[in-house]
């Protein structure tokens, strides 16, 4: 029975996201576990169009966008030292982390 830990990271700033992935990878490699990644996932671009003026000039509009960058890390056959190392990693405030435990047969 082989277990996997999948770590998905999301951030609006790609530099803080890359720094967080480096910290997680170095923490896992210190425990001599097998890690795959970081795998860059497709970024999501949200675009918003608003009127510049509240009442008139309908043709005058302004466009904004926000980009969500994502990375995936997969740890094969983790041991308790890996879980302990992951709990001690301190990440930036703008990085969202989702951890999934997958047990395979």
UniProtKB/Swiss-Prot annotation:
Any GO CC annotation of this UniProt entry: ribosome
S-S bridge residues: none
An example molecular function term from Gene Ontology annotations: structural constituent of ribosome
Keyword annotations from UniProtKB, A to Z: Ribonucleoprotein, Ribosomal protein
GO biological process: translation
InterPro entries in alphabetical order: Ribosomal_uS10, Ribosomal_uS10_dom, Ribosomal_uS10_dom_sf
Record-linked SUPFAM superfamilies: Ribosomal protein S10
Cited HAMAP family: Ribosomal_uS10
Similarity comment text for this entry: Belongs to the universal ribosomal protein uS10 family.
Role played: Involved in the binding of tRNA to the ribosomes.
NCBIfam families registered for this protein in UniProt: PRK00596.1, rpsJ_bact
Complexes and interactors: Part of the 30S ribosomal subunit.
Protein name: Small ribosomal subunit protein uS10
Organism: Rickettsia peacockii (strain Rustic)
Name of the gene this protein is made from: rpsJ
């Amino acid at each position: 029975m082989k277990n996997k830990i999948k770590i998905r990271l999301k951030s609006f700033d790609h530099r803080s996201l890359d720094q967080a992935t480096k910290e997680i990878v170095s923490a896992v490699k210190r425990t001599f576990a097998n890690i795959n990644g970081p795998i860059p996932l497709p970024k999501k671009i949200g675009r918003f169009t608003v009127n510049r003026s509240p009442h008139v000039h309908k043709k005058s509009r302004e466009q904004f966008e926000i980009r969500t960058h994502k990375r995936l890390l997969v740890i094969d056959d983790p041991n308790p030292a890996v879980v302990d190392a992951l709990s001690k990693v301190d990440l930036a405030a703008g990085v969202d982390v989702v951890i999934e435990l997958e047990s395979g047969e």
